Amino acid sequence: MVTNRALTYVNSSTPLKIIENEIDLDNCYGDKEIVVKVHAAAFNPIDFILHDFANKWLVGSKPKTIGRDYSGEIVKVGEKVDKEWAVGDKVCGLFDAVYNEQGAMRDYLVFDPESSRTKLLTKLPEFHDAQHSDYVLGAAWPLVFTTTIQGFTDYGQKFGPDSNILVLGASTSVGFHVIKIAKELYNVNAVVGTCNSKSFERNKEVGCDYCIAYDTEDIPVRLKEVITDELKGQKFDLIFDCAGYNDLIPHINDYLKPKNQNSQYINITGTVKYQFDPKKQTKGFIWKSLLGMCRFHRSFNYHFLLMRTERSIGPKFKEFLSNGHYHPPIDSVTPLDQYKTAETKMRSYGAKGKMVISFE
């Protein structure tokens, strides 16, 4: 018997809480399942949004484990599991289950690696990082990289040296990946990013060619100047909205290339940015987001991107990693028993990189 800690909640009115139970590693899995000893797991904003929307009448009274991104070691393998997976394998992946007893933030995960919810499972890459372990970095990329790469590949676009990309929310984890993938995988002409003026240096180091400060500049006006003066009148092939910023929508033709050129506007947050602070929360967040998307999506190519778990993502990530210029950005690594520190920072949108929880 081993102790299995899990970071859980019951519904939106209950705070996160570590619970413990005993599990028998010899009898807790089926013939088609594996058991992963989790070494690290990472928070994403969606984890806390799901917590906040966990209506007690809809989600039931059982504890739900928070988290999706994880890394660890396989410690048990069922008899009918594909020979690709073996005891001792170091792995990382995404456990894409909503309001489930299991989630990434627990000592042991038990699952079928062929399930649609867990197909994003891959051998842990070697990152050769002097500051963080492979386990920490392995837990930092699955959700954000998957979201980003699907935004680049799902809609038939071809990117190259003539392409221009706008990232709304360049300092977010997904924004970071949009910049890196655009510059290093697709070698685009220019990436323009919006961010706080304090983040200019960081985002330019990542690869952003032009930064626009949302705290000191008028974004629509400044964007027009960049298009005219820096991009020689060429508009954007892709606008990737990681921040829920809508001020460009009324005059989208000033910024986005024509629809018949297969230009795309991709949104990953909804049209209204979610506020974790109850005093700032937007009433009707879900409905306003849905109505906003329905209202304008027909006039140009607009997509609200919903990430999918796919086995093919692992090889794509390793290809991206192989160029040697990429490490997932880490804000901090926090022991499980100090999770409240990480939660507070996530809910304030203060993280500059991934908030990783250590299970070592």
From Swiss-Prot:
Q: Which SMART domains match?
A: PKS_ER
Q: Which Pfam families match?
A: ADH_N, ADH_zinc_N_2
The alphabetized UniProt keywords are: Lipid droplet, Mitochondrion
Q: Which domain of life is it from?
A: Eukaryota
- Which compartment or compartments is the protein found in? Lipid droplet; Mitochondrion
Which family, according to the similarity comment? Answer: Belongs to the YIM1 family.
The protein here is known as Protein YIM1
Give the organism the record lists.
Kluyveromyces lactis (strain ATCC 8585 / CBS 2359 / DSM 70799 / NBRC 1267 / NRRL Y-1140 / WM37) (Yeast)
